[in-house]
């Protein structure tokens, strides 16, 4: 999995490419934890995320809980396959997801 980050003031935008599974979720958790101090607005761009496993869902929930205490988190550009997983597991009700009818604006080009 590839992770790209952009910090603008108290806003952190993170784009993920590849698979967020049991192995890469550990890497992602460690990577993002180092960057959350002072962040009030976290944007996760999932346009290039092909797959998410339960370990990845756990990280998203953990991030949402953390950001609820220090600001907000929004997930955007969710692929159809990832959205299906979020819907089937009920996570789409727990996470702030930008709706698919919003125009896609890619954060990074991988």
Model-inferred region functions:
Residues 1-52, 62-110:
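STAS-like cytosolic regulatory interaction modules
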């Amino acid at each position: 999995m590839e992770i790209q980050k952009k910090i603008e003031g108290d806003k952190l935008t993170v784009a993920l490419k590849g698979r967020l599974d049991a192995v890469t979720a550990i890497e992602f958790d460690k990577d993002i934890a180092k960057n959350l101090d002072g962040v009030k607005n976290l944007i996760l761009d999932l346009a290039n995320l092909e797959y998410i496993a339960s370990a990845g869902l756990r990280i998203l929930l953990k991030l949402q809980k953390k950001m609820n205490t220090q600001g907000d988190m929004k997930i955007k550009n969710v692929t159809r396959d990832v959205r299906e997983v979020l819907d089937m597991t009920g996570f789409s009700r727990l996470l702030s997801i930008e709706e698919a009818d919003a125009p896609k604006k890619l954060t990074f080009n991988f």
